């Protein structure tokens, strides 16, 4: 699972198809295996801290459903 903490800006967070707006100071809990996405809604940079928990931490555990940035 992951936890995101918004440090600066305004974000649209989508978890399993449900959208919420979050602001500085908000904490978002993302359940294991949930489809999730974060988008900047501010004119300033969106800054957030991501905390991962579990047994495995590597980029190859990511499954990109939609990639607007061609990663």
Where are each of the predicted segments found?
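Short acidic-glycine-tyrosine-enriched beta hairpin
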Residues: 3, 16-35
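Broad hydrophobic/π-residue packing in well-ordered secondary structure
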Residues: 3-5, 29, 62-63, 69
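Glycine-centered flexibility sites
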Residues: 9-11, 25, 33, 54
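Short, surface-exposed beta-strand-loop junctions and turns on beta-sheet-rich folds
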Residues: 12, 19-21, 44-45, 55
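Double-stranded beta-helix
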Residues: 37-71
């Amino acid at each position: 699972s992951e936890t995101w903490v918004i440090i600066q800006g305004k974000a649209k967070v989508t978890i399993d198809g449900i959208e919420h707006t979050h602001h500085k100071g908000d904490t978002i809990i993302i359940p294991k295996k949930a489809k999730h996405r974060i988008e900047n809604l501010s004119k300033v940079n969106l800054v957030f801290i991501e905390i991962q928990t579990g047994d495995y931490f590597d980029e190859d555990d990511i499954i990109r459903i939609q990639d607007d940035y061609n990663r």
